[in-house]
Amino acid sequence: MQRGIVWVVDDDSSIRWVLERALAGAGLTCTTFENGAEVLEALASKTPDVLLSDIRMPGMDGLALLKQIKQRHPMLPVIIMTAHSDLDAAVSAYQQGAFDYLPKPFDIDEAVALVERAISHYQEQQQPRNVQLNGPTTDIIGEAPAMQDVFRIIGRLSRSSISVLINGESGTGKELVAHALHRHSPRAKAPFIALNMAAIPKDLIESELFGHEKGAFTGANTIRQGRFEQADGGTLFLDEIGDMPLDVQTRLLRVLADGQFYRVGGYAPVKVDVRIIAATHQNLEQRVQEGKFREDLFHRLNVIRVHLPPLRERREDIPRLARHFLQVAARELGVEAKLLHPETEAALTRLAWPGNVRQLENTCRWLTVMAAGQEVLIQDLPGELFESTVAESTSQMQPDSWATLLAQWADRALRSGHQNLLSEAQPELERTLLTTALRHTQGHKQEAARLLGWGRNTLTRKLKELGME
């Protein structure tokens, strides 16, 4: 690959400076621009190998610039940069033909590697895709790197109808991602039908999926369409697919292979065109090894895998998510949105959140109703949040260990709004150790100092500081 020519457009001079030097250091020729109008003017006489553009700029923004570039130079790869990391920005960039999406703050080495990949792509004369779809906004929020990967996958699948398997713990937002995949796909105007395998009695799953004929079983008084027929032309979301019985897995596999099925009690085949998005919190590979999930069905579903991280692995997103959920809850209840005190925001970020995003959302609803003031303080938070965090942090400890008791004390103190816990705890810890050591040595100070790992002078000073002389 020949060394390439890179143009950078950003109204932030510091970003231009950093990228210009990093790209020059990689042997690339870099020219910077302050706004989109300057880029379009320069494009009238020459063309780079790749363009990096900020998305939020005065005047012409990055998406408007991208649209004009794709009309004039459809083969030119454009990388969109933004500090506003959300799904709609990523999808809009991909749908309008962006080569890739680079959220700020970015790792400079990764940015250079992405530019070099785009140059290679351009020099190989590969035509990038250009799709004009403007899907509705969603409630998927995330600036964490793992969520940016999810946004990229949704953007890259915006012209596709292939099967997707979503993995993630309960409450991580798997159905939201499934909705987003549907909304940003060619099937967006067709139905999106969801079915949770774990919520349906096993003997009713076949009827729910495939429908039934009149008289197929006791109580089947009319013909009933199943979820496959309801989703014809659109998307069928099968949540908790790992709980699907093996016999139903066999029928599902046939539908995926043939595009047709029989209603329960029926003899005429029903043809459908349905995209399958499946989700699970289980390890399907392990279920396959245990003989509880068909391997051939697993491979049919696992064309594209999307992993949703638990909330504890994307703590930087918690404040923004909490503010969003407080605003949503306020709109639902017709009240003014609560505000988070900075200490409360920090406390939320430290919590365990075993229920993930769903638990955070429910907590924000609870706070909207139950918090006394307009500003949410630490003492307004429900106690079970701290109990679950303490339980998680002490799960590896003995139930009667001093560390467990210390963790429980710290939990109570934080809930009461205490600060500077170390300055409060350390004197008590030293007083307890001194008292115990002196009792053990029948008041012999030199021996007590030895047991504590102190010199005699240190012990004497500590006794004085703690008022124990």
UniProtKB/Swiss-Prot annotation:
Keyword Metal-binding in annotation: no
Gene3D superfamilies per UniProt: 1.10.8.60, 3.40.50.2300, Homeodomain-like, P-loop containing nucleotide triphosphate hydrolases
Biological process, per Gene Ontology: nitrogen fixation; positive regulation of DNA-templated transcription; regulation of nitrogen utilization
Domain Response regulatory: from-to ranges: 5-119
Portion annotated as DNA-binding: 445-464
Binding site for ATP: 168-175, 231-240
InterPro entries assigned: AAA+_ATPase, CheY-like_superfamily, Homeodomain-like_sf, HTH_Fis, P-loop_NTPase, Sig_transdc_resp-reg_receiver, Sigma_54_int, Sigma_54_int_dom_ATP-bd_1
Compartment(s): Cytoplasm
Sigma-54 factor interaction domain boundaries: 140-369
Keywords: Activator, ATP-binding, Cytoplasm, DNA-binding, Nitrogen fixation, Nucleotide-binding, Phosphoprotein, Repressor, Transcription, Transcription regulation, Two-component regulatory system
Modified residues (4-aspartylphosphate): 54
A GO MF label: cis-regulatory region sequence-specific DNA binding
Record's keyword annotation contains Phosphoprotein: yes
GO CC annotation: cytosol; protein-DNA complex
Post-translational modifications reported in the UniProt record: Phosphorylated and dephosphorylated by NtrB. Phosphorylation induces strong cooperative binding to DNA.
Domain notes: Contains an N-terminal receiver domain, a central output domain, which hydrolyzes ATP, interacts with RNA polymerase and is required for phosphorylation-dependent oligomerization, and a C-terminal domain, which is involved in DNA binding, dimerization and phosphorylation-independent oligomerization.
Function: Member of the two-component regulatory system NtrB/NtrC, which controls expression of the nitrogen-regulated (ntr) genes in response to nitrogen limitation. Phosphorylated NtrC binds directly to DNA and stimulates the formation of open promoter-sigma54-RNA polymerase complexes. Activates transcription of many genes and operons whose products minimize the slowing of growth under nitrogen-limiting conditions, including genes coding for glutamine synthetase (glnA), transporters, amino acid permeases and catabolic enzymes.
Subunit description: Homodimer. Phosphorylation of the N-terminal receiver domain leads to the formation of oligomers. Can also form phosphorylation-independent oligomers.
Protein name according to UniProt: DNA-binding transcriptional regulator NtrC
